[in-house]
UniProtKB/Swiss-Prot annotation:
Binds 1 pyridoxal phosphate per subunit. This is Phosphoserine aminotransferase. The modification N6-(pyridoxal phosphate)lysine is found at K199. Its EC number is 2.6.1.52. It comes from Streptococcus thermophilus (strain CNRZ 1066). Homodimer.
Amino acid sequence: MTIYNFSAGPATLPKPVLEKAQAELLNYQDSGMSVLEMSHRSPEFDKIIKDAEATLRELMAIPDNYKVIFLQGGASTQFTMVPLNLAQGKKAYYLVGGSWGKKAYTEAVKLSKTIPFEPILLASSEDTVYDHIPSFDPSTIDPEAAYVHLTTNNTIEGTSIYDLPDTNGVPIVADMSSNILAARYNVEDFALIYAGAQKNIGPAGVTVVIVREDFLNDQPQLSAMLDYRIQAEAGSLYNTPPCFNIYISKLVFDWVKNEIGGVDKMAEIQREKSGLLYDYIESSDFYTNPVKDAKDRSVCNIPFVTPSKDLDAKFVAEADALGFKNIKGHRSVGGMRASVYNAFPRQGVLDLIDFMKKFEDENK
């Protein structure tokens, strides 16, 4: 039985990446050591991390005046690290189109009780269960604000921002955790991008931060571990980084570049792959996708429901027994969610659609 992993993260990794990691696990390139055990100061790892950065820069067309940092703590740590480094003494706006954006705003509010800055909720679609990306009047944004924070892809609700909003000249900070490398963005449109690895980059445990150099604050932070400047100047080696996770990420970057053909080709594949499932849901009067506007639909996370919660539960149980794993929707929204990140096979979407048709026929 073929197993398809629809998990929202940690997610499917490319098979060639896993095979290469397996082949090199005990003896990395005749070093006599595994990457799991080699020093982060060794010449072997120095090449790994530099190659990882170079390939990511090429894939995303990252300009020279941006630093790339590999950090620990997941994207959730960035909810604190961003305002701590960028917003002291200023306003910071938050566009909340999903649960993770709300968490970022909530953490900012919590931090504002400790350091002087003002987090402002710019707009939210929480009142409609985040079924769309909220709009706002850019003239309401103070042009002296530190940044506008947004989440480019909402894993739970299945929405995405593809065209960046007008922010009245205020720099944009983006949580790009769940659609980085799956859609093309112009890095120069952002002051800072951060992304947890466990969707489209690699295993959980490493977070990529891409930050424009003029946003590296000279003021000492509460902790050196939370200071972008210190981390950037140390080349991501201020302390021992998650070496193996960075190594796997490098292999994924190589896969996107050499086997897929780059981000534009990857984005094309994602649009086609997710479109198969969206088209079927649209053609069905049994399944529903809750996203209000088709232009907001995610190419990575596709939530859907049947006519009842009982049928949802039955669907999840039967799907799991057939190898469609982790397809249950997030507890906050229910239903089902098919997360089809970059490494998820197209055949898995086709097989899921076949099962959905069969389930619909048997349960109408």
